[in-house]
C-alpha cells in the first residue's frame, strides 16, 4: 500500500493508483464529531415525501414509485465474471450496479441532491409567503398560480453538466427562471436539452471552479436569485444521504445481509464530492462499520483524493501537481474539491482509486455487452475500484475484510447515462 506522499507522487505521474485512508476510524466516532445528524436526514427524507405528489403529477415516470425519485439495484453477475476473467479481479460474493444512471427526472445521481436542493428552497419560499402548510397536498405546486409565483425568482448553479440538468429540469417544472453556468467540459447535448426546457445556459471556456464562481457572483446581484452551491451546500449533501436509507431497503428485498461478517463495499465516482460524500455519510449512518466506501476519480482530475491524501482539502487543486483536470468523464472533470465534503468524510471514506479514460470506456463497453446496460463514462469509474481492491491482499488482510471476502456485497454506483442521446451512446460504445 502507498502512503499518502507516495500516492500524491503517483497522481503526478498520471498512474492508476490506490490510496487507503489512514485516518478512517469507527463510524460512531466519525458521525458523533459532525454537526449533521440522523435528524437532518430524517428531515430531508420527510421533505421528499411531502413533494412526492407534485413530482408524481409533473414527472409521470415516477408514478410507479409514488413520486419518489429512485433507481433500481441490479445484480450484475455477468459483469463480475467478466472482470474476474479479463481484468484479473478476485471479486467474490455479489456485485451490484446501483443504477442512478436511470434515475427519473434527470437521469443521474444529481437528481437526488439537485432536485432536493431546489425543493428545499421552494418549500422555504412557499412557507415564508404562506402559500402552503406542511400538512397540505403538495400537488398544488404544479398549478399555474404557484408557477407564476416562482417565476419571480431565479436559480443559479455552476455545473459540468448533470447537476445543471437536475436543477434546470426541476426548477423549470416549478416555474423558476434558471441559469446554469457551464464549464468548458460540459457536453453540447446537455446544453441543448437545458435550453429546450427554457433554461438559460451560460458557457465558459474555463473549468468547473470558474463556472461555479461566476454563478455565485451573478446570484449575489439579485436578492430574488438563489445560488445552489455544489461546493458547500448542506442541502445537496443531505439529498444524497437519503439514498442510503432507500438502498438499505433494496438490499433487504434482495436478501442481502450487511453486518461485520457480511461487509458492504461501495465504489462511487467522485467529482467535487457532494454526491459521493453525502452517500458515504448516509451509508455510515445506516450500516456503521460494515459499510466500506471508496471514491473513484479520473487520473487527470483526482481532486478529492488529492485533497484528502495531502490533508489540504480545497487548498490544493490538480493543476498544482501538473494535471489538467480534463477527462472524457465530464461529470468528474473537477480540479478543486469541496472543502466541506472533505472535512466531513475524512474519517469515514475508506480510500479511493484513480482510473484512466481508456479503462472507463473498456468497462462501459463490457457492461453493455455483458448486461445490456448503458451508462456514461463517468458512471464506470467505480469498476476500477472494485477490481483493484480485490487484488490488494495485504490491505484486505489488515483491514479484516479478507476474512469475510466470500460474504461481501459490492456495489458500483452508476452515476449517469439515461438521458444520453442515441448518437452519443453509439460514439461511446464505439470508442
For the regions a language model picked out, list residue spans one by one.
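PLP-dependent amino-acid enzyme catalytic core
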Residues: 1-431
Amino acid at each position: 500500500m502507498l502512503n499518502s506522499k507516495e500516492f500524491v507522487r503517483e497522481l503526478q505521474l498520471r498512474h492508476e493508483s490506490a490510496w487507503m485512508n489512514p485516518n478512517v476510524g469507527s463510524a460512531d466516532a466519525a458521525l458523533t464529531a459532525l454537526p449533521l445528524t440522523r435528524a437532518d436526514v430524517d428531515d430531508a427524507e420527510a421533505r421528499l415525501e411531502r413533494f412526492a405528489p407534485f413530482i408524481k403529477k409533473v414527472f409521470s415516470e415516477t408514478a410507479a414509485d409514488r413520486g419518489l425519485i429512485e433507481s433500481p439495484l441490479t445484480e450484475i453477475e455477468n459483469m463480475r465474471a467478466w472482470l474476474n476473467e479479463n481484468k484479473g479481479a478476485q471479486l467474490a460474493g455479489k456485485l451490484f450496479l446501483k443504477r442512478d444512471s436511470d434515475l427519473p427526472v434527470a437521469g443521474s445521481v444529481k437528481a437526488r441532491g439537485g432536485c432536493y436542493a431546489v425543493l428545499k428552497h421552494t418549500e422555504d419560499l412557499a412557507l415564508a409567503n404562506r402559500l402552503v402548510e406542511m400538512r397540505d397536498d403538495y400537488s398544488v405546486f404544479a398549478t399555474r398560480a404557484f408557477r407564476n409565483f416562482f417565476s419571480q425568482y431565479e436559480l443559479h448553479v455552476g455545473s459540468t453538466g448533470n447537476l445543471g440538468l437536475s436543477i434546470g429540469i426541476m426548477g423549470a417544472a416549478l416555474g423558476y427562471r434558471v441559469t446554469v453556468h457551464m464549464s468548458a467540459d460540459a457536453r453540447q447535448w446537455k446544453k441543448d436539452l437545458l435550453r429546450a426546457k427554457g433554461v438559460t445556459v451560460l458557457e465558459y471556456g474555463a473549468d468547473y471552479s470558474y463556472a461555479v464562481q461566476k454563478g455565485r457572483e451573478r446570484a449575489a446581484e439579485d436578492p430574488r436569485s438563489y445560488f445552489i452551491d455544489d461546493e458547500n451546500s448542506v442541502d445537496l449533501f443531505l439529498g444524497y444521504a437519503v439514498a442510503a436509507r432507500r438502498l438499505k431497503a433494496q438490499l433487504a428485498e434482495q436478501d442481502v445481509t450487511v453486518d461485520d461478517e457480511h461487509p458492504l463495499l461501495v465504489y462511487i465516482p467522485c467529482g467535487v464530492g457532494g454526491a459521493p460524500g453525502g452517500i458515504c455519510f448516509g451509508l455510515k449512518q445506516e450500516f456503521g462499520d460494515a459499510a466500506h466506501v471508496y471514491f473513484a476519480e479520473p487520473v487527470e482530475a483526482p481532486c478529492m483524493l488529492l485533497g484528502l491524501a495531502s490533508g489540504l482539502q480545497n487548498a490544493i487543486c490538480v493543476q498544482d501537481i501538473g494535471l489538467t483536470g480534463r477527462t472524457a468523464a465530464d461529470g468528474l472533470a473537477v480540479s478543486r474539491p469541496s472543502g466541506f465534503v472533505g472535512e466531513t468524510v475524512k474519517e469515514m471514506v475508506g480510500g479511493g482509486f484513480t482510473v484512466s479514460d481508456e479503462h472507463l470506456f473498456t468497462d462501459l463497453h463490457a457492461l453493455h455487452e455483458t448486461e445490456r446496460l448503458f451508462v456514461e463514462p463517468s458512471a464506470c469509474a467505480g469498476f476500477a475500484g472494485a477490481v483493484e481492491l480485490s487484488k490488494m491482499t495485504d490491505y484486505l488482510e489488515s483491514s479484516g475484510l479478507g476474512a469475510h471476502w466470500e460474504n461481501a456485497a459490492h456495489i458500483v454506483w452508476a452515476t449517469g447515462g439515461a438521458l444520453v442521446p442515441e448518437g452519443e451512446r453509439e460514439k461511446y460504445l464505439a470508442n
